[in-house]
Structure formats: structure tokens, C-alpha cells
From Swiss-Prot:
Region feature Disordered, mapped onto this chain: 20-70, 497-547, 662-693
The organism of origin for this protein: Homo sapiens (Human)
UniProt KW Coiled coil keyword: yes
UniProt feature, compositional bias: Polar residues: 674-693
Coiled coil (UniProt feature): 14-611
UniProt-listed InterPro entries: GOLGA_cons_dom, Golgin_A
Keywords, ordered alphabetically: Coiled coil
One Pfam family matching this protein: GOLGA2L5
Composition bias type Basic and acidic residues, residue spans: 537-547
Domain of life of the native organism: Eukaryota
Listed name of the protein: Golgin subfamily A member 6D
Name of the gene this protein is made from: GOLGA6D
A single BP term in Gene Ontology: Golgi organization
GO cellular component: cis-Golgi network; Golgi cis cisterna; Golgi cisterna membrane
Amino acid sequence: MWPQPYLPPHPMMLEESRQNKLAAAKKKLKEYQQRKSPGIPAGAKTKKKKTDSSPETTTSGGGHSPGDSQYQELAVALESSSVTINQLNENIESLKQQKKQVEHQLEEAKKTNNEIHKAQMEQLETINILTLEKADLKTTLYHTKRAARHFEEESKDLAGRLQYSLQHIQELERALCAVSTQQQEEDRSSSCREAVLQRRLQQTIKERALLNAHVTQVTESLKQVQLERDEYAKHIKGERARWQERMWKMSVEARTLKEEKKRDIHRIQELERSLSELKNQMAEPPSLAPPAVTSVVEQLQDEAKHLRQEVEGLEGKLQSQVENNQALSLLSKEQKQRLQEQEEMLREQEAQRVREQERLCEQNERLREQQKTLQEQGERLRKQEQRLRKQEERLRKEEERLQKQEKRLWDQEERLWKKEERLQKQEERLALSQNHKLDKQLAEPQCSFEDLNNEKKSALQLEQQVKELQEKLDEEHLEAASQRNQQLETQLSLVALPGEGDGGQHLDSEEEEAPRPTPNIPEDLESREATSSFMDLPKEKADGTEQVERRELGFVQPSGVTDGMRESFTVYESQGAVPNTRHQEMEDVIRLAQKEEEMKVKLLELQELVLPLVGNHEGHGKFLIAAQNPADEPTPGAPAPQELGAAGEQDVFYEVSLDNNVEPAPGVAREGSPHNNPTVQQIVQLSPVMQDT
């Protein structure tokens, strides 16, 4: 490698080096600004690098280069940047102070807002209190209006219920007729079904015989096919052994020919070597060769030709043997393919045989199942007949039970009426004594506190007596109502669910497809008179529930009167003790309101206890209006209410119990109603007067 000559730097290269140096200086300035510490000016290092890299660019005589001026500019820029940094720090501190002032102002504003919010909350609380008082006043007005509307709605509801009950009775009569017709049709169809079942049995027996014959034929054909298959397999095995022997012989011959060929090739190679040696000897300068040598050479040439001919013959034999081997391999392959095809055919035949056997088994199973189903259907028909007979017996027994229950209910009603008369007399006596006492108190408002306390004690004793009587009557009525409910629920369950009972066993899916038998209703119930007597039982339950509700009203109103008297006594005591104190008046008003709420709660609890046992009733006034107008006929234009779905046994019974074909005694109903009782009306009129005073 020759040394390269030194060339001067290009001016473009100089400019690039300067730009690189400027970029490095800027980086160093940034680092200086970040660290804020004085450092060595970047010009010295760059100057050294510049002098090392390009010594020719240095100026002579100690003159300043343009790089020095740039370094000075950079130093000036550093000083100016430090000044700007100081100014920025001062600005930041001033901004922080302003921020603190603003935060202080915000805190003061929040405090003022909180105070305003508290004042607003206090005002809202006062407004809420006023609204609550207003709501209480509205509720009192609403309850009074609601009571008036409630009585009107109940009267309309009763008229609709009566009409609906009549329609329901007609529907039940139609259902009874339909049940009787269905039973007759089923009796007719049962005989037809037995004939059809016998025909099916005969057909199935014939089909089974045909299938058995077909099975025997198929089994014989399968045996023949198996014998043919065995013979053919033996023949194939013999041919395969023959072909294997021939292949073994051909392979042995091929091996011998290959060995002979190798030997001949070895001899030919030796002869060729000897010929090459002789040719080399012949190529040498001619010498006086004896004639014996020439003769030897000729002999060798003849032998070589003879050997070549033999080799060619052996090659032809090898090719022919190879062709024969290929033909044999093709034949063996074809035979293998044929054998595989035959094996596949045999497998398919076996699969078909298995399928036919499975089909035959399935057909036999189907026939057996059909026989079982036919037998089961016959048994079911017999069981259905037995069930119908049992249901007839049950209905007769239930009729006897219902007649006995009617007698018991009449006896219980007579006892209840007697107790009601006694209670009404006691109520009248209590009301008269209370009226006399109230008249005396109103005439002499400045009586002594001892008289007021005695009256208060007497009122409490009366209340206790009334409560005890009420509890006794409630227990008796609840027991009677529970007994009636149980008896009538059992009756309705038997009528609504005729399929259930002692004979109601689990049926299969095939039985569900056949029409279910309807209960055989006795001939006594098909007549109009029998149905009316059958439907009078739920009506008697409705009468009993009306009596219970009347007694509840009779006890609730005197208890409300005693509560009003007690409240009036407390007001008089507070006025006598401190006549001109407004605070005690407010306390008295609060006590009165609390007592009213307690009485309302007690009334609601009594309603919740009594109503579920009596029936799903909506109010106490319904049965009062029904008792006053028991024989009102429904208007023809009144719309019938929609039929209810499968609600339950209690709902069905409630719909039936509203039918009142038997009119109760009008005098008894009016005596039990509080609207026609003069003593109760006087007490009700006096109670608001005492509250106003």
C-alpha cells in the first residue's frame, strides 16, 4: 500500500465543523443553565480540537479567529439568561403571594355561604313543619270524604256482585248438564274403544306371525352366504400359497443370475486390463515380437468377444426376468384388491344381516309395547269406572253431611242472635247512663275533680267489659267461621277437582291423550231445586259473615264513644287545673291525636284478624247494605264483571257466597245495624260536640 498524498480541507467541510462546534457549545450552555454553576468556557476545548484537527486554519501573528467572537457572544448570552432567570424567580414569588390572598378570600366567601345555607335550612325546616300541619288537616278532610265515597262504592259493588253470583249459578248449572252429557258419551265410547282394541290386537298378532316367517327366511339366507364365504376364503388361500412359491423360485433365479453377471463383469474387467497392457506393449517401439505373442493376443480378443456376447445374453435374460417379476407383482396387487373388495362385500352383508336383526327386534318390541298399552288402557277404563262409582258415593255422603251442617249452623245462628240481643240491651243501658252523665257535665262544667275521676274509672270499666264481650264474641264467630270455611272448602275441592281423591293415581302420558272422565253427578242434583239447595250453603256462610261484621261495628262505635269521652275528660281536667295556659292545650291536642291513631291501628288489626277468616271481603259496610236489601234483584242492564281465572278455592267460594236466594228476617237485620239504632246515633252525635268543647 502506497502512502496517500495530504490534501487541504474543503471549505464545505470547514463550515460543517463550525456548525458542529456551535451545537456542542449550545448543549454546554443548556447544561450550565441547569446546574447554575460557573464552568470552563466551551471555547477552549473546541479551540484545542480545532487546532488539532485543522492546523492550517490558525491565524498568524496571534490574531483572533471568528470562533473567539462566537465564544464571547455565548458568554454574554449566559449573563443575560442568568438575569432573566432572576427576574422570573421574583415574578413567581409575587404570584405565590397573590395566590395566598385569593385563597384567603375564598375561605371567607365559603364561611359566609355556609352561614347563609344554615339560615336557609332553618327556614326550610319551619316550612316543612307548616306543610306537615297542613297535610294533617288535609288528611282529616280526605278521610271524611273518603268514607262517604266508600259507602257509595260498596253499594254499587254489592249490586254487581249479586248479579255476578246469579250468572255464576247459571254457569254451574250448565256445567252440571255438560258433565252429565259427557259421562253418557264416555260410556258409549268405552264400548267402541274395546272393540277397536280387540281389532288392533288381532292385527298385531297377524303382523307378528308374518315377521317371524320373514325372520326365518333371513336367517336361512344368512347361513347360505356364510358357507359360500368360507369356501371362497379357502380357494383364495390356496391361490395365495401357489403365487408365493412361484415368487420365491423367481427370486432365487434372479439372485443366481445376478451372481453370474457379477462374475462375468469381473472377468471382463480382468480381460480389459490385460488388453490394455498388451496395447501398451504394442504401442512401444516395434521390436521383434515372436509369433507366439501375436497368437496369444488374438486368442484373448476372441475370448473377450465371446464373453461380451455372454454378458449381452445374460442382460437379456435379466430384463425378461424383471418383466416377469413386474407382471407377477401386478397380478398379486390385482388379486389383493379383489380380496379386499370381496372382504368388504362380506362385511357389508354382515352389517345388513345385523341391521335386519335389529329391525326385527325393534318390531317385536313395538308389538309388545302395543300389547302392553292396550292392556293398560283396558285397566284404566276399569279404574275410571270404579272412580266414577266412588265419586257418586262420596257425593251422596257429602249431601248427608251438608244437611247435618245446615242444622248445626241454624242452631249456632239462633245462639248468636240471642247474644246480640243481650249485647244491644247492655249497649243501650250504657249509652243511657253515659248520656245522663254527659248532660250533667255539660250543665255543670265546674264540677269537682273527684267526680271526673270517678266517671273516668267507670268509663274504663265499661270499656273493659265491652272488650271482654267483644273478645268472647270474636272467638265464637271465628270458630264458627273457620268450621264453615273448612266444610265448604272440602265441598268445593271435590266439585272443582273431581279427578283427585282416593282413586286419583298417577296417569301416564298415553292416558292424558285420551279424554278424561268427568264425575258422575247424581240425578238429585240435576234438578233446579237440588241445585238451589246445594248453593244455599255458601249463602248461609255469607249471612254469618254479615252478622260478625255487624257485631264488630256495634262494638267499635261504643269503644270510639268511650275514647271520645276519655279525651273530653282529659280536656276538662287540663282546663280546670290551668285554664289559661296554651301549652297544656297543645299537649291535650297531641294526646287526642295519638289516641285517635292508636284506635285506628286497633281497628285495622281487628279487621286483619276477622276478614281472612270470614272471607275476602273489602269492607264492613257491604254486608250491612246487603242485609238491609237482601231481596234486591239485579238490573238487566248492569254489566257483569269479568270472570276470574284459576284463583283458588277461597276466591271461588267468595263468589258463590254472595248469592242470597233465602231472605233473612228484615227485623233482625235492621236491629243489628247501627244506622237504625237510636242510642248509637245519639252517642255518635254527642262525641263531636265533646271534642269541640
